[in-house]
Amino acid sequence: MADEERLKEFKEANKIVFDPNTRQVWENQNRDGTKPATTFQSEEDIKRAAPESEKDTSATSGIVPTLQNIVATVTLGCRLDLKTVALHARNAEYNPKRFAAVIMRIREPKTTALIFASGKMVVTGAKSEDDSKLASRKYARIIQKIGFAAKFTDFKIQNIVGSCDVKFPIRLEGLAFSHGTFSSYEPELFPGLIYRMVKPKIVLLIFVSGKIVLTGAKQREEIYQAFEAIYPVLSEFRKM
């Protein structure tokens, strides 16, 4: 019973880690065969290969974290009859006993929307800011076609999740001891070290394998900045 209570407290303290949008990424990262971050041979290669928004972010490590999930919110500006939405929209499900929102999916961009009766909408699964906005507009248009006076307003990115692989094992015990102010490491409860960076305000999940998940960003640059800030620390605690 004590262990169950301890696990409950741990999850409560680390809600962002156990949020489904983040959890899916770290569970995939913690398996073999996951797609690693892009690694380049030189700084010039990085500058040539990275898009404009990614340039000058990897001068230290040679690694650019991959964006895995973007969570955005939209206000549709009208109340919705969720039964009507679920009845007339494709790839939509509504089970009010389980969850008080319509769950709708589209294939391009591959995303999922949670649509609430209040007219609030949460869109997850996009791999870029542009795809997130495009998907959100598509969902709003679907609601309009059903017959509601929906508008596309107040689009906001709430969370960006990224990941990468530093390609070397990390001594998590040493890292936790040396950076105890920022670190939480309970290997019996969670396989990774949870590192709460102050600036930028990002949570990093660091695994002994060298896989890293970064979450809590509002802009992609924060993902890149956080990784470049943590990389020298990870190198210091590299397993030899």
UniProtKB/Swiss-Prot annotation:
Residues covered by region (Disordered): 21-61
Source domain of life: Eukaryota
Pfam family, one: TBP
Subcellular location: Nucleus
Keywords: DNA-binding, Nucleus, Repeat, Transcription
CDD domains per record: TBP_eukaryotes
Keyword Transcription on entry: yes
Xref: PROSITE patterns: TFIID (PS00351)
TM region(s), chain numbering: none
Spans of repeat Sequence: 67-143, 157-234
GO molecular function, one term: RNA polymerase III transcription regulatory region sequence-specific DNA binding
Biased composition (Basic and acidic residues): 44-57
GO BP, one annotated term: negative regulation of DNA-templated transcription
Disulfide bonding pattern of the chain: none
SUPFAM superfamilies assigned to the protein according to its UniProt record, in alphabetical order: TATA-box binding protein-like
InterPro entries membership: TBP, TBP_CS, TBP_dom_sf, TBP_eukaryotic
Gene Ontology CC entries for this record: nucleoplasm; nucleus; protein-containing complex; transcription factor TFIIA complex; transcription factor TFIID complex; transcription factor TFIIIB complex; transcription regulator complex
Matching PANTHER family: TATA-BOX BINDING PROTEIN
Function comment: General transcription factor that functions at the core of the DNA-binding general transcription factor complex TFIID. Binding of TFIID to a promoter (with or without TATA element) is the initial step in preinitiation complex (PIC) formation. TFIID plays a key role in the regulation of gene expression by RNA polymerase II through different activities such as transcription activator interaction, core promoter recognition and selectivity, TFIIA and TFIIB interaction, chromatin modification (histone acetylation by TAF1), facilitation of DNA opening and initiation of transcription.
Family: Belongs to the TBP family.
Quaternary structure (record): Binds DNA as monomer. The 1.2 MDa TFIID complex is composed of TATA binding protein (TBP) and the 14 TBP-associated factors. One copy of each TAF1, TAF2, TAF3, TAF7, TAF8, TAF11, TAF13, two copies of each TAF4, TAF5, TAF6, TAF9, TAF10, TAF12, and three copies of TAF14. Interacts with TFC8.
Designated name of the protein: TATA-box-binding protein
Organism for this UniProt entry: Saccharomyces cerevisiae (strain ATCC 204508 / S288c) (Baker's yeast)
Lineage per the UniProt record: Eukaryota, Fungi, Dikarya, Ascomycota, Saccharomycotina
Gene name of the encoded protein: SPT15
